[in-house]
Amino acid sequence: MNVSRRSFFHAVAGVGGLTALRAQVAGPGTPPLTFTPDAATKSTVAIVKGEVRRKMVADALNAIDHQIRPVIQRKKYVVIKVNNVSTTNQLAATHADTIWGILDYLQPKYKMPVSIVESSAGDTMEGFRNFGYVKLAADSAARNVSLVDLNAEAKYQVIPLIDFDLHLQPVRLAARLLDPDAYVICACMLKTHNTVVATLSVKNMVLGAPLHFAPKETPRWNDKRKYHTGIRQTHYNMLLTAQKLRPNWGVALLDGYEGMEGNGPSSGTPVPSRIAIASTDYIAADRVGVECMGINPAWPGYLNYCGQLGLGNYDIGKIDVIGAKIADVQKKYQMHADIERELQWMGEMKDLPIKLG
């Protein structure tokens, strides 16, 4: 029987997904791959359905305040990590009303400075201006809100990643996202992606942390490009970065008021999902987000890796969803045009060096 590449991927994705693919190379009796420290611990994810973005965001965070409070009370300031992969397309970027919703949640309870931060692929401050963050910060002067271009701040820690040839290469990660005094809030959206299937909270943190040259700096350099070394290497490097950032993650806020389908993360089309998702477990938040987008959860490799390594719960059976039900808010997002190539991380590697020993 002749099976096309398209038919193969759809068949595998529909029947067991990642498990089915791994079964081709795993011998009989191979134990499940998991490093979860406490398999009995469940995560809570709140889903709020509504029509007012700002209120939905605040309501989602308030729903899990009992989990946020014990940690944030030990911190000195709040970092809101936005997602401005584009500095000109609002659909691809965190909306100012999302930030307002976060501030509405924070201010009555937690009187501490707030820094809105980003390391955009382009000019970070251009995005801050275009999307209304500069006005927001000015209007919030009494709340001690500031804007920080992480590229211009130029403070970092170095971690090793792998390149296409599996050799080590250094990458500079924004130090502020690793500051133990900061309570880090991820403010992102529901979007499809051109490399890793879907981008939600983990992707926002992991690819927002690597820096590039500061404005007017020469010679130019860009550590974000080091993640685009190969479809398999990308997922693994994202895992390594998530592992480094994870101890400083506070709460993930996924703004699904208007998601993006098709050719995300910058050039897709809007989907009126009208939801907000919040959790102190970024991996669980993203699993619920993927479900709400109607995406096969086996497809985003980096999220499966993070779940296997115990960075959070990716198993839907270990997630308590409060508020709206997934089935009631789920929409089937159209995938990126390159989805077939994106899924090639799942199969066997064909061009490998010889085996020795």
Give the positions of each predicted feature.
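N-terminal and secondary-structure boundary signal
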Residues: 2-357
